[in-house]
């Protein structure tokens, strides 16, 4: 019973890797998409407002932090709140 479960998991893992490789080959390299992704991340962390606290800056409430950052309650620092976009 244990052996059949392990074999099933191994087959599923191989199928996942195979499907991922086929999709990557079909779609092409991610290197073309990387610069756009990096520029969008730069816009998130280099916002025009400089009145706010940057990443890992001290804070007391969420409004102290820049966009897409939130004040962590335990150590009182600005960290990413998990959002993207404007």
Swiss-Prot record:
**Superkingdom of origin organism:** Eukaryota
Q: PTM Phenylalanine amide: at which residues?
A: 84
| Pfam families recorded | Toxin_12
Q: Where would you find this protein in the cell?
A: Secreted
Where is it made, tissue-wise? Answer: Expressed by the venom gland.
State the signal peptide span: 1-21
What this chain does, per the entry, is described as: This toxin acts as a voltage-dependent gating-modifier. It inhibits the sodium conductance (IC(50)=124 nM) and slows the fast inactivation (EC(50)=1180 nM) of Nav1.5/SCN5A. It significantly shifts the activation to more depolarized voltages and decreases the deactivation of Nav1.5 currents upon extreme depolarization, but only slightly affects voltage-dependence of steady-state inactivation. In addition, this toxin causes an approximately five-fold decrease in the rate of recovery from inactivation and an approximately 1.9-fold reduction in the closed-state inactivation rate.
Leftover remarks = Negative results: does not show effect on Kv1.1/KCNA1, Kv1.2/KCNA2, Kv1.3/KCNA3, Kv1.4/KCNA4, Kv3.1/KCNC1 (all expressed in oocytes), voltage-gated sodium channels (Nav1/SCN) (from DRG neurons), and in a range of voltage-gated calcium channels (expressed in rat DRG neurons). Does not show significant toxic symptoms when injected into mice and into cockroaches.
Tell me the protein family, please. Answer: Belongs to the neurotoxin 10 (Hwtx-1) family. 28 (Jztx-11) subfamily.
Q: What is this protein called?
A: Kappa-theraphotoxin-Cg1a 1
Taxonomic source organism: Chilobrachys guangxiensis
